[in-house]
């Protein structure tokens, strides 16, 4: 089967935004206009195609990033009349599902950033924007909900410049705002576009309304100045007052967008069907095809030698698995992005992370939760494989004769955990397996057993995250479970450098045990995790015992030394030691490593850490005092405040332990008129009185 669409006519895009900016509605409209849907779905009536889990339809929010493919032929511009394929990943906007956004951005070549014309840049917009910056994803911005009361296009553009530090360049300005929103002025072609009041897919091209002509000219000059800064020839023409063609403007705009030095700005109302077709034209015109993206970098699994794979069908096959999902009909689905080469259904791939070879039974093209079997998947495409058993998110799949490891994805550690127990004996049998499946799909969801109580603990990124996973247990896996109160995932670390000798000796007739290690422990900066340095010289400890020392240290770190919480941000150097020809063993050195670490950590000024959350509350002015007072009473530190979209906002850093049940309290405090967003910021030292009470709990638990 030959490639259907030339590689330079493919666009892999994501739609990213704050929770209520209209992401799913916009995707629905895209699918409608590209002919994939025959009836438009609405989020508010639970009929949207991309929201395919039951909870998503109930809550009206998107949780998993569904992948779909569609085709579009631009009506205007440098690609006019040429059919293109668009692969879309619809990403969630709720902060608890950051991992879904992170992993979809990793495999995209471009994104449409949606902003609400009333709210402008909101907290989650900032988070998603930072993630897109991390992966250098080119973006266009679409200011949605122009029909809403209080919509202000220019305020939204200003907030993109000020809050995101971006360089927004409007390519359109609205004709009317709020109920009066009728269409927009196209600043490249200097034409007005007026939409039919009843049917938004019908529009008329008109001369620019008289009262907007001066404003349109001013914004066109703004656009030309911004664009000409990126091209010397254009700059010369502009300064000499020569005519600049639309084609030249678009060409340089495309280059600047791909370099992420300009963010083209469009406007519309997806719900009212205004502006979506022009946004699709802009996706084709300004966002990258796989050909525009640099060769993907990786390394050889054995030699660590750098390898790059060019985006062509002729290169050996290399792909990144970016999502695992359980499908009720075909079982485990592995979503992957092909960076080079071709994969045929039925062929074998090598997973260079596990070292295992696996057969791809079927290759599926996904349309939300419907699927279509395809014979082969080509470079630049996004598809799903059936039949891969041992693949995890972030694994590299490649041609077995040309192994490569692509850069792995790094996911944040969970900050909240709850105990979970099955309601009945039959639930008990299924619980472990079901939780394992959910953990396989979501790298920020962890399952562990409390060694002292035997309880199963589940950990995640927030209350909503865990609530939805427990809900999925009930709906998809038919497992009923009781859950405990949320607990904070405290951590421990050290503040001083210390050297210590760890010794394990047991000699009581027969073969004994002997291991002696000299360790130096020192603090690392926050977020660095754990580092082990092997500084053994002259074979004072044989090579084969050193991994055992490392394993012993890591085991000891899990239980901490202050209140039984895992330790982080520590470097341990093994610099000396002794061994015995007969009595030494891996086990002896593992125990010596554990003893040495615990002894050193106790002397290294150990402290307890707690997760601090970045909280932003938007509230009507009359409740501002109450909101601020309440945040302060929760040990919150107010970082800033101001006005946004006719309301007040307060930004604060608050310990997670003080935020449980906050949504209920905020609702009653503001009669349901305030809302808030919360995301993990960092770990900070716990105040002494709280640390002492946590230690007391630990001591009384040990005494039991």
From Swiss-Prot:
Which residues are the signal sequence here? none
> So where does GTP get bound?
17-24, 90-94, 144-147
Q: Which coarse location class applies to the principal site listed for this UniProt protein? A: cytoplasm
Question: Where's the tr-type G domain?
Answer: 8-291
Q: Which UniProt keywords apply?
A: Cytoplasm, Elongation factor, GTP-binding, Nucleotide-binding, Protein biosynthesis
Keyword Protein biosynthesis listed? yes
Named from the GO MF annotations, one term is:
GTP binding
Domain of life where this protein originates: Bacteria
Annotated localization? Cytoplasm
Keyword Cytoplasm attached: yes
Which Gene Ontology terms of cellular component type are present? Answer: cytoplasm
**A biological process from GO:** ribosome disassembly
Membership in a protein family: Belongs to the TRAFAC class translation factor GTPase superfamily. Classic translation factor GTPase family. EF-G/EF-2 subfamily.
- UniProt function note: Catalyzes the GTP-dependent ribosomal translocation step during translation elongation. During this step, the ribosome changes from the pre-translocational (PRE) to the post-translocational (POST) state as the newly formed A-site-bound peptidyl-tRNA and P-site-bound deacylated tRNA move to the P and E sites, respectively. Catalyzes the coordinated movement of the two tRNA molecules, the mRNA and conformational changes in the ribosome.
> What name does the UniProt record give this protein?
Elongation factor G
Q: State the organism of origin.
A: Chlorobium chlorochromatii (strain CaD3)
